[in-house]
Regions:
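Non-catalytic alpha/beta scaffold blocks inside enzyme catalytic domains
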Residues: 13-20, 27-40, 44-225
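Conserved hydrophobic/aromatic pocket- or pore-lining residues that grip, position, or stack substrates
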Residues: 10
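Short, small-residue-biased leader/transition segments that mark boundaries at the very start
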Residues: 1-3
């Protein structure tokens, strides 16, 4: 963190802040975190940081070649505290740091019809967050918990839950191919170095299998050959 602060202060002293083409690169903590947020693994926005307005959904409906009304029908509605009915389509979701509240909090306080019943931890270890005691309780209250990682993380061993827990082994970066986004927003392509170990699968294969099981793989992958 000190290095990041000093780098920004240095750029400020050089006059490179607040100017066209200036600024400092965003330092991210893990490989391709920038690409993940650009692609929108977020609870509060569509890809490209478009937000969740009706206009944003209509834009991405056109990009995806999807019917806007079909997408809209996939979301539940909820009557807010102001008495107005709101579609969850336009409401910010629960951030990863507070998913615990989605399980343990009274559902009248979480602005969605029901509490969370299932969680998928995909490339995420909860020991990077606080409230571990509450997290353990929340995990044990879930009906379903899925952990997707190259190796078992704290997500897989924190709770004493004995059923409804699945560990899906994913490949490492050396066992698959694909693009990553550097902190300067440049794209880099990586080739597969070795074959996947044991039964592990690349992330894109796992998500395809999920989509196929849920019945919308044809829609999700229609533009991917």
């Amino acid at each position: 963190m000190c290095i990041r602060d000093r780098y920004c202060a240095f750029q400020l002293a050089l006059g490179n802040m607040g100017t066209a083409g200036g600024g400092a690169n965003i330092f991210r903590g893990h490989d391709n975190v920038q690409g993940a947020t650009d692609f929108c693994i977020l609870s509060h926005s569509l890809p490209g940081y478009y937000g969740l307005s009706a206009g944003a959904w209509k834009h991405w409906s056109r990009v995806w070649g999807e019917d806007y009304n079909w997408l809209k029908a996939r979301f539940a509605s909820l009557k807010g505290k102001d008495g107005k009915t709101k579609s969850l389509m336009n409401q910010k979701g629960i951030p990863v740091s507070r998913w615990i509240d989605g399980v343990l909090e009274n559902k009248d306080n979480i602005e969605q019809p029901d509490n969370l019943k299932a969680m998928v931890f995909w490339g995420h270890a909860p020991n990077s967050q606080t409230r571990m005691k509450e997290m353990k309780v929340a995990m044990e209250k879930l009906d379903l918990m899925v952990v997707i990682d190259p190796y078992p993380t704290v997500s897989a061993v924190l709770s004493d839950k004995t059923d409804g827990v699945y560990l899906l082994p994913s490949t490492t970066q050396f066992e698959t191919y694909g693009s990553v986004t550097a902190s300067n927003r440049s794209l880099q392509w990586r080739e597969k170095v070795i074959e996947p170990s044991f039964d592990s699968l690349p992330d894109h294969t796992i998500i395809y299998k999920f989509a196929k099981k849920f019945g919308f793989a044809d829609r999700m992958f229609r533009q991917i050959k």
